[in-house]
Amino acid sequence: MVVRKVGKYELGRTIGEGTFAKVKFAQNTETGESVAMKIVDRSTIIKRKMVDQIKREISIMKLVRHPCVVRLYEVLASRTKIYIILEYITGGELFDKIVRNGRLSESEARKYFHQLIDGVDYCHSKGVYHRDLKPENLLLDSQGNLKISDFGLSALPEQGVTILKTTCGTPNYVAPEVLSHKGYNGAVADIWSCGVILYVLMAGYLPFDEMDLPTLYSKIDKAEFSCPSYFALGAKSLINRILDPNPETRITIAEIRKDEWFLKDYTPVQLIDYEHVNLDDVYAAFDDPEEQTYAQDGTRDTGPLTLNAFDLIILSQGLNLATLFDRGKDSMKHQTRFISHKPANVVLSSMEVVSQSMGFKTHIRNYKMRVEGLSANKTSHFSVILEVFKVAPSILMVDIQNAAGDAEEYLKFYKTFCSKLDDIIWKPPDASMRNRVTKAKSKRR
């Protein structure tokens, strides 16, 4: 019998399958460790233009170390497939436990709800939202502790990230604002799903469950449900505050953590200390396989990518076509750029030196540089992507984007970073003149 291998992993039986992906049991041949390997069709991601979103979320999830979240170890790729290596959880789905045994006791339901909120809150703090929380995505380890699966992978097609797929798939756990086909806040929508899950754990059945979709949607939209009489008053009160159809007034996770019913027997999870994680495998997996082959052939360096007129229009701050499709308030804050007349290798090496002097690690590949490290408060990961483009024979443009971390911290980084690159950043003559006049005035004062 021929044993199939992917990298150092020996593949076994299929343990899960969806429309666009399958999950196989696999074993690390170097350590003997069992893992779950999610196999995704590369062309599906490219066709649906989801590369950047999935790359970002997988990058962040590789950095996540939380006892209540299934760990993502690494990402491998072939020409046609992307292989996501995940922690293998042996205890099965929480959903199966409910089907087998019926509703849980109040204390057991509360324990799982504690772990659910801890895991969800931690991932939200990293900027990743699940968007498809349900008991089937909650696994149990060998000790019976809850592990949230597919966090950060919800952007993959089979996970139902689109409103259409979610609506047609498992709408029973979905927030009213998601079903309304309007924009929604991922964190607030996840909280609603947590409330439905808590109800199911304690009741053994769904709060919203109708045979026809119009009636189901109507009940979800109005939050028409009732709690069984055996629910404790504290549990009823909390569930009612979570299943608030108005996302603006719905309880937040911070408020859930202060709730009297929630606090009973609550022991915060012990977080795993930050450790440096290399993201090269993630970026390589999502690169164009043709580019990878080209690079491996040892072909001579042809310099930075040259932008054409249309590329420049799209990247221009004065006419950013991307804003037509993304009207988020932070869309312009996360992306910045500058012009330089220096040679590309000088620009790249200068940026590397400055980044390292600011205490960050750098990774360079094909005129792209990733800068990463801890945030200013040392509690989360911070990462920036820089790419050098050729605009004209002696003009380069450096595009800088926030990859992980909040907008305010990114803007502080950008300001400090550019102030240290004065010798390579080109400024228009009138801007240079204004700077000299301003400095002269300040000296006279």
UniProtKB/Swiss-Prot annotation:
Keywords: ATP-binding, Kinase, Manganese, Nucleotide-binding, Phosphoprotein, Serine/threonine-protein kinase, Transferase. Pfam families: NAF, Pkinase. ATP binds at I15, G16, E17, G18, T19, F20, A21, K22, V23, K38. The modification Phosphoserine is found at S154. Mostly expressed in roots, and, to a lower extent, in leaves, stems, flowers, and siliques. Residues 9-262 form the Protein kinase domain. Residues 150-177 are annotated as: Activation loop. Residues 333-362 are annotated as: PPI. Gene3D superfamilies: Kinase associated domain 1, KA1 (3.30.310.80), Transferase(Phosphotransferase) domain 1 (1.10.510.10). It comes from the Eukaryota. Its cofactor is Mn(2+). The modification Phosphothreonine is found at T166. Its EC number is 2.7.11.1. InterPro entries: Kinase-like_dom_sf, NAF/FISL_domain, NAF_dom, Prot_kinase_dom, Protein_kinase_ATP_BS, Ser/Thr_kinase_AS. One of its GO terms (molecular function) is ATP binding. CDD domains: CIPK_C. It catalyses: L-seryl-[protein] + ATP = O-phospho-L-seryl-[protein] + ADP + H(+); L-threonyl-[protein] + ATP = O-phospho-L-threonyl-[protein] + ADP + H(+). The activation loop within the kinase domain is the target of phosphorylation/activation by upstream protein kinases. The PPI motif mediates the interaction with the ABI (abscisic acid-insensitive) phosphatases. Interacts with CBL1 and CBL9. Belongs to the protein kinase superfamily. CAMK Ser/Thr protein kinase family. SNF1 subfamily. CIPK serine-threonine protein kinases interact with CBL proteins. Binding of a CBL protein to the regulatory NAF domain of CIPK protein lead to the activation of the kinase in a calcium-dependent manner. This is CBL-interacting serine/threonine-protein kinase 8. It comes from Arabidopsis thaliana. The lineage of its organism: Eukaryota, Viridiplantae, Streptophyta, Embryophyta, Tracheophyta.
